Amino acid sequence: MSDFYQDFNKRRTFAIISHPDAGKTTVTEKLLLFGGAIQLAGTVKGRKADRHATSDWMEMEKERGISITTSVMQFVHNQHVINLLDTPGHEDFSEDTYRTLTAVDSALMVIDVAKGVEERTVKLMEVCRLRDTPIMTFINKLDREGREPIDLLDEVESVLGIQCAPITWPVGMGKRFKGIYHRYQDIIYLYQQGSNAKKIDATQIKGLDNPQLDELIGDSAKELREEIELVRGASNEFNLQDYLAGKMTPVYFGSAINNFGIKELLDDFVEYAPGPQPRATQERVVSPNEETFSGFVFKIQANMDPKHRDRIAFVRVCSGSYKKGMKLSHLRIGKEVQISNALTFMAGDRSHTELALAGDIIGLHNHGTIRIGDTFTQGEQLKFTGIPNFAPELFRLVRLRDPLKSKALLKGLIELSEEGATQVFRPLNSNQLILGAVGILQFDVVAHRLKYEYKVDCIYESVNIACARWVYSDDDKAMSEFRTKAYDYLALDGGDMLMYLAPTKVNLTMAEERYPKIKFCATREH
């Protein structure tokens, strides 16, 4: 095994964030292509054939062409091990994406050159700002007409509140797209169209003033020199410390579908992006260079392999190393478990791993005992913080078409809620089951998966609930009185936590005023 495999400093764990259709899945594919992880990139147009994008492996994702669940892919580039966490491209899955961003050390933001900064990008950026996550930016689709690069940089700076430092710069765009200029290497990479081969041998011209440039691209050379002169005066120079502090984003331009500009991005990413970072727990800060193992569960995925009906808990390794057969303490349930079959990931292709270090993501087989937010250590009592759960904003009543399937329905809903795909509530005053979600598409996913994975067909009806809040109190007497008086509005969630289901926002406000000793919470830590 190569030395760099055994060095946690050589790990780079990141996620890609973007608005839907900015080309995130294509960028993911091309990073894997350059990392040697796949030979042929499955394009969006190829979805009707058997060739689907590697990271979109769930049946419903293949039908719709959007990434619904977070995939984990590991590949090697320039003697570094890269863990890429693909996040859902659809806005309804912000919760899953939010939790994924707690498991990474940096992020790559993909922006469509024609559309600029879009709403979802703004939301995801806010999440990254909470943890000062370092961010690189890739402005995509330069093979199409779009907005002026300098205007895009201004927009990123003003809307997202982060300084931009352009590393590469486009030579034209759309039909006039001739290539990119790497400002720090002083090399022009000339554009060649074509999406499947690795274009490592693209024509390179050393030096902005090289007369060969004028011969090959004509008047575009003069335009480029003038633009670069402007850029030097108007933009920020790259500062590594500002990038690592989350204050500056290095910016790259290219066309992912044509493999162009990706290699330059990947080379710099490996060099500049941070390795595994220290992590906060309730007890202390855990450093990645500690010898003993620690990690937390940020995602649970059911039925990654429909043939085996299995569930996998995704664990971010924070310190130490996982070795096959080691014993770990599962702290929430107070049990020691032997882990002999952890998995690493290449989208849906899973392989058993012998070793995982800080920064790596491993998959543990889960038979219903592991939940999102659980901590695993070699005995020390730790609880990693900052893994959020959000109160849902949309609700549906679930009714079975076949009443004899109630056991299968409850099992399916509890498993799907443990994944974080949806939340399930059981009102105290009835046998009803109510689904809660952050976005409307989540209901479609649950209906689809209940039908095909659990063989349960249901009717989903609207229900008179406007919002939900977790309720707590340090005063047992006040809580007991509240449970009695508000009984008809209370329900248990999938983890048996008490929730208040308010029929209107006014009702919630009145309840908060009437019961001042009760805390009504829209988020909670896992």
Curated annotation (Swiss-Prot):
It comes from the Bacteria. One of its GO terms (biological process) is regulation of translational termination. Keywords: Cytoplasm, GTP-binding, Nucleotide-binding, Protein biosynthesis. The keyword Nucleotide-binding applies. Residues 9-277 form the tr-type G domain. Gene3D superfamilies: P-loop containing nucleotide triphosphate hydrolases, Peptide chain release factor 3, domain III. InterPro entries: EF-G-like_DII (IPR053905), EFG_III/V (IPR035647), G_TR_CS (IPR031157), P-loop_NTPase (IPR027417), PrfC (IPR004548), RF3_C (IPR032090), RF3_dom_3_sf (IPR038467), RF3_GTP-bd (IPR041732). One of its GO terms (cellular component) is cytosol. GO terms for molecular function: GTP binding; GTPase activity; guanosine tetraphosphate binding; translation release factor activity, codon nonspecific; translation release factor activity, codon specific. It is found in: Cytoplasm. Its main location: cytoplasm. Pfam families: EF-G_D2, GTP_EFTU, RF3_C. HAMAP family: Rel_fac_3. NCBIfam families: prfC, PRK00741.1, small_GTP. Increases the formation of ribosomal termination complexes and stimulates activities of RF-1 and RF-2. It binds guanine nucleotides and has strong preference for UGA stop codons. It may interact directly with the ribosome. The stimulation of RF-1 and RF-2 is significantly reduced by GTP and GDP, but not by GMP. Belongs to the TRAFAC class translation factor GTPase superfamily. Classic translation factor GTPase family. PrfC subfamily. This is Peptide chain release factor 3. It comes from Legionella pneumophila (strain Lens).
